[in-house]
């Protein structure tokens, strides 16, 4: 038998103005997946889940309904059909969750990415990281009913990732500015992605579309030129944030606290309830994160929270 341990970190989707087309990875926290392969013949599903920890018993053990095992099944099917690789034997999967569920931190994407990194290593690296993204996206469909890539792609590839097109999938990896730091604060409450998506408008005005496009373009330009002030000015979302902000207790105060502490900009992480802020130094990022935590605690619900300060992860999913 052979075992491989994969790891993938938290990600932030949307990045304010880039709804469903932009995301980035941080260095920690993240999920771990341990895959163990045996050559013995096994009837039934070729992948089984041996254990899940850190989820409070909420995640399914059915390998076809769990994101981490589902993507491994898709991966095995692909390399058998398109790469002509022998996939006999059985794979046992152990999932160690370190990311909170329904948090806006890319929890399902991290599990899928860690599982795919381990599976690819276990089977001799038959796929590129870019190929693995396709399977991770299908995992998002299982997790929340929508096959979006703004968490899945950076979980696999690291950096910032821009999704130019979904059909066909066209991803652009954008390396982060050297001094860009993220403060990520997760209040102790859940907000299901499916519900957070249900409050969004199905149509937007041309005026709002123009503002959103301008900010997306400016944000990408700011990242590519290390123009930190431009990055901050571009973190403006006129589409999703106005609808989702009321779902997060104390959001306005938390955002204001981050900006007053010196952050470049601040917005909702993915569908929430976590909130992220960008800063141009680790010191400012820590100050912004602490200010955000205090604001959550001062909100009507007196929410406690967890906080991480991190540079942007350049590596993506990896083997431990």
UniProtKB/Swiss-Prot annotation:
Top-rank lineage group of the source organism: Bacteria
Binding annotation for ATP: 100-110
Xref: Pfam families: GHMP_kinases_C (PF08544), GHMP_kinases_N (PF00288)
Keyword terms of this UniProt record: Amino-acid biosynthesis, ATP-binding, Cytoplasm, Kinase, Nucleotide-binding, Threonine biosynthesis, Transferase
Compartment(s): Cytoplasm
GO annotation, cellular component aspect: cytoplasm
EC number: 2.7.1.39
Gene3D superfamilies documented for this protein: 3.30.230.10, GHMP kinase, C-terminal domain
HAMAP family: Homoser_kinase
Protein name: Homoserine kinase
């Amino acid at each position: 038998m052979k075992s491989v341990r994969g790891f993938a970190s938290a990600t932030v989707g949307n990045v304010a103005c880039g709804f469903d087309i932009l995301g980035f990875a941080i260095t920690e926290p993240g999920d771990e997946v341990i895959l163990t392969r045996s050559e013995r013949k096994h009837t039934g599903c070729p992948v089984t889940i041996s254990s899940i920890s850190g989820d409070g018993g909420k995640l399914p053990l059915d390998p076809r309904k769990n994101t981490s095992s589902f993507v491994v099944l898709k991966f095995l099917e692909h390399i058998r059909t398109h790469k002509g690789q022998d996939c006999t034997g059985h794979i046992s999967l152990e999932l160690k969750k370190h990311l909170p569920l329904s948090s806006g931190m890319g929890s399902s994407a991290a599990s899928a990415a860690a599982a795919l990194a381990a599976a690819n290593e276990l089977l001799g690296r038959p796929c590129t990281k870019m190929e693995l993204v396709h399977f991770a996206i299908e995992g998002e469909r299982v997790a929340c009913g929508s096959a979006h890539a703004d968490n899945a792609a950076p979980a696999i590839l690291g950096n910032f990732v821009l999704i130019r097109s979904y059909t066909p999938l066209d991803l652009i990896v954008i390396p982060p500015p050297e001094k860009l730091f993220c403060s990520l604060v997760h209040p102790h409450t859940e907000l299901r992605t499916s519900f957070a998506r249900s409050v969004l408008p199905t149509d937007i005005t041309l005026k709002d579309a123009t503002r959103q496009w301008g900010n997306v373009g400016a944000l990408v330009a700011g990242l590519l030129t290390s123009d930190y002030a431009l990055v901050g000015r571009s973190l403006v979302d006129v589409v999703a944030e106005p609808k989702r902000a009321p779902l997060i207790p104390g959001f306005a105060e938390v955002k204001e606290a981050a900006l007053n502490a010196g952050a470049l900009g601040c917005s909702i992480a993915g569908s929430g309830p976590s909130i992220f802020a960008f800063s141009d130094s680790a010191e400012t990022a820590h100050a912004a994160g602490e200010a955000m935590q205090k604001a959550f605690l001062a909100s009507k619900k007196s929410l406690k929270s967890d906080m991480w300060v991190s540079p942007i992860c350049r590596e993506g999913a990896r083997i431990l």
